[in-house]
């Protein structure tokens, strides 16, 4: 799964259609590292009002060693996620999204990748998505959309960092509290084959206080359970799968190569709505599995190592407009 495909899944999760589903009000904290389930839908009570959500986040993945190789790695990320919904009636809307994230990778003695021990230093990931969700009768809905993603290390060629994707899916809402769906996301990759992945959509308001929902943000997708003891607080436990891939520096140890990472985060998040338009978030998590891959400019694998599990902490703030 590429970063671009993660972005498509994020847009698909955001674009859930059907009868209004109560929202827990907690967007992701850390672009797939630490956060609450993404908001699954927009209610119809806002009429024709344009809805926007802006999330700013930061996180740190603590140092972990490589399995069967020398060295260790830690990661620090900062970024933003912007989601805009332009309603077209009660259950239809145009959807726009823009995500930006910068990551610093601190490799120490990782000589299994390159002799210098530092296969790459940083990565910037940018993603723009556009889509449309609509209704078919009282219970069925659909979503279609596309995105373009640029991901590159400082000094990497921007044109060679672009990937493109699209998605399509259907949802069925049996009631105001339960929506199920299935779709397909397709994405090009950097020096690799096109990838197509089916994705589920689930939003189940078990009670006034409990929500089970699939989530998607720009770097991953998964399933979360949220508890809302009151209107101000939300506590979420979630697990998922995330990925990143990016074009490397033209003058680096592997010129124009590709760096890839996969991870399986398990996270606990607390979100505090201090104002109807402002929510503070803090999360702690565990990278249960991590994998780092280094490819050359033609996509040939040079090295691939799993990393040990690692602690993750993240903070964020969401503004709604």
Model-derived segments and spans:
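Transmembrane beta-barrel strands of outer-membrane/channel proteins
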Residues: 52-62, 96-102, 144-150, 182-186, ...
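Residue-level signature of outer-membrane beta-barrel architecture
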Residues: 84-88, 132-134, 168-172, 186, ...
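Short glycine/proline- and aromatic-enriched beta-strand/turn motifs that initiate or cap beta-hairpins
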Residues: 15-112, 213-218, 235, 246-249
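Hydrophobic, lipid-facing positions within transmembrane beta-strands of outer-membrane proteins
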Residues: 76-82, 124-130, 146-150, 162-168, ...
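Outer-membrane beta-barrel "beta-signal"
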Residues: 198-207, 268-273, 278, 305-321
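Sequence/structural signature of outer-membrane beta-barrel proteins
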Residues: 59-68, 101-112, 135, 147-157, ...
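Repeated loop/turn-to-beta-strand initiation elements of outer-membrane beta-barrel proteins
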Residues: 90-96, 138-142, 176-182, 209-213, ...
